[in-house]
Curated annotation (Swiss-Prot):
Disulfide bonds: none annotated. The keyword Kinase does not apply. Signal peptide: none annotated. Essential for sporulation. Interferes with or is a negative regulator of the pathway leading to asymmetric septation. PANTHER family: SEPTATION PROTEIN SPOVG-RELATED. This is Putative septation protein SpoVG. Belongs to the SpoVG family. Gene3D superfamilies: Stage V sporulation protein G. Keywords: Cell cycle, Cell division, Septation, Sporulation.
Length: 96
């Protein structure tokens, strides 16, 4: 499995979310709503999730091993940093 495309939009929020990404896997499968989060130990990628009735978050889609998680994170963060080198217009979180 290879990440063949990354589409990313930065968001301007009060919280720790810095961007929302969509990735294409092997040119055939797209995963939307991947979040770039500024955590205590630096940036990381959070897979799309939804809140359960008991208030916890559960991933909707996620890699099943750390090797593939690393590939996704590396590709998304590389695009995030690449966009950081050019002037970007921020979107307000939740804007369509």
């Amino acid at each position: 499995m290879e990440v063949t495309d990354v589409r990313l939009r930065r968001v301007n929020t009060e919280g720790r979310m810095r961007a929302i990404a969509s990735i294409t896997l092997d040119g055939e499968f797209v995963v939307h709503d991947i979040r770039v989060i500024d955590g205590n130990n630096g940036l990381f990628v959070a897979m799309p999730s939804k809140r359960t009735p008991d208030g916890e978050f559960r991933d909707i889609a996620h890699p099943i091993n750390s090797n593939h998680r690393g590939k996704i994170q590396d590709a998304v963060l590389a695009e995030y940093h690449r966009l950081g080198e050019v002037e970007v217009e921020f979107e307000e979180a939740g804007a369509s």
